[in-house]
């Protein structure tokens, strides 16, 4: 059972690393508000390591790692991470360029079937900057689809042998045995020089939706912003704590308690 977020619990956890989702966790109503962006800077200036973990595309992640106060970004649901090594941007992918090209060709078949069989669905507007997956929009730029339509989209991916995960705005699908948590493990071992099982003792994860459940499972300390509440009954693994506020305001609430 998730608990209300409390600064005393966070203090005892001795947190140094913040892994956070972006959409509806850092953002509010599709925008990164000033208070949440300031909270990122407050964490950075206090010495925390910040790693966004998102389903957003490679093109967005390039900008995020260059312009936000973060140490790395894990994108497209674990397909890669970007970080700086010194002054040079480093990109780590789970597969080769040839494999990515072949997978995109297979995903185009899924795209055609989804658009034909699920009226009202659309390819996500950020698809043109994606390298690993296919994102189907069910509420970002289209009228919100119902749960049955979302489940139908997932089943089409799975019928084609692809992995499918539901975020707060998209159904993301891809080919390959990877996830957000698998790339978090790779990042910890490669860039931090320690296994995730050691890093997680001083780390927390922040999220808002069912595709964050593996991270809720594997992190010792996890936080759900309050909009996670509508999904809780469907989650086997729930966040340790829940904020009072939604989205970016919930993230700010968390940061204020961390820095108290």
What are these regions (language model features)?
Residues 113-218:
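Conserved acidic, metal-coordinating active-site core of Asp-based
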Residues 1-20:
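Non-catalytic pre-domain segments flanking phosphatase-related domains
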Residues 18-20, 73-74, 205:
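Residue-level marker for buried hydrophobic side chains located in beta-strands
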Residues 8, 13, 33, 181-260:
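Mg2+-dependent phosphoryl-transfer enzymes with acidic/Ser/Thr/Gly-rich catalytic loops
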Residues 29-126:
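Active-site phosphate-binding/coordination module
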Residues 68-69, 77, 160, 218-219, ...:
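Short, structured coil segments at secondary-structure junctions
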């Amino acid at each position: 059972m998730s608990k209300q977020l409390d600064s005393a619990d966070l203090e005892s956890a001795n947190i140094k690393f913040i892994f956070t989702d972006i959409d509806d966790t850092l953002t509010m109503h599709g925008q990164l508000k000033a208070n949440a962006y300031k909270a990122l800077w407050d964490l950075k200036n206090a010495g925390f390591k910040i790693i966004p973990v998102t389903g957003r595309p490679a093109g967005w992640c390039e900008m995020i790692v260059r312009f936000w106060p973060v140490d790395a970004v894990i994108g497209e649901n674990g397909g890669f991470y970007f970080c700086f090594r010194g002054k040079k941007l480093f990109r780590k992918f789970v597969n080769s360029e040839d494999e990515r090209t072949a997978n995109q060709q297979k995903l185009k078949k899924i795209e055609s079937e989804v658009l034909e069989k699920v009226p009202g669905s659309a390819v996500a507007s950020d698809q043109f900057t994606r390298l690993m997956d296919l994102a189907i929009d069910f509420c970002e730029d289209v009228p919100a689809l119902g749960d049955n339509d979302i489940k139908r989209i997932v089943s089409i991916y799975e019928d084609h042998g692809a992995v499918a995960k539901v975020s707060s705005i998209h159904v993301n699908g891809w080919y390959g045995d990877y996830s957000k948590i698998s790339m978090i493990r790779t990042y910890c071992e490669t860039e931090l020089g320690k296994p995730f099982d050691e890093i997680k003792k001083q780390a927390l994860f922040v999220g808002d939706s069912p595709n964050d459940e593996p991270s809720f499972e594997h992190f010792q300390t996890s936080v759900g912003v309050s909009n996670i509440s509508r999904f809780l009954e469907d989650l086997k693994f729930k966040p340790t704590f829940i904020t009072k506020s939604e989205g970016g305001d919930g993230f700010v609430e968390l940061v204020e308690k961390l820095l108290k």
